[in-house]
Amino acid sequence: EHIEQKKAIYERYKEGLKGLPVSMNPMDLENSEPNYWLSCLIIDKEAMCKQVRGEQDVCYVKESGKSCPTEILEAIASINAEGRPIWKPMHMQPIYRLNPFVVRDGNGRAKSNAYIAGDVADVGMDIFTRGLCLPSDNKMTVEQQDRIIEVIRACFE
């Protein structure tokens, strides 16, 4: 019953956010059976407004037709709903910051610099930058979830 409630939450988000430049949790339904623990989204790269996340502070610049996780989290917090950033990858944590980590092209240390041309090869950092966990409590009402969806849609206007 719990998994069915979580699945219904996920499906309502997926349907309600259709048409926005976002992707919901990717899953391989042929080879796995998801538990729908969290409903998460990732904003498409071209739909991201400018955002910088520090250790404790974050700032962003609102752009028409674009949004970022910080804007969405602030917007849903304004209606008393709680989301959160996707977990920060281990190699970005202060204690591990200087250690090597693996990316598609080998060691990722010193390849995630703003001055190096090209796409980010660090998939974990990219997901952290563009993703967020949506309110997913199974005690949330359909009306509350509809309001959250409405607020998220407004962030992209």
Question: Residues of each region from the PLM?
Answer:
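PLP-dependent aminotransferase class I/II
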Residues: 1-157
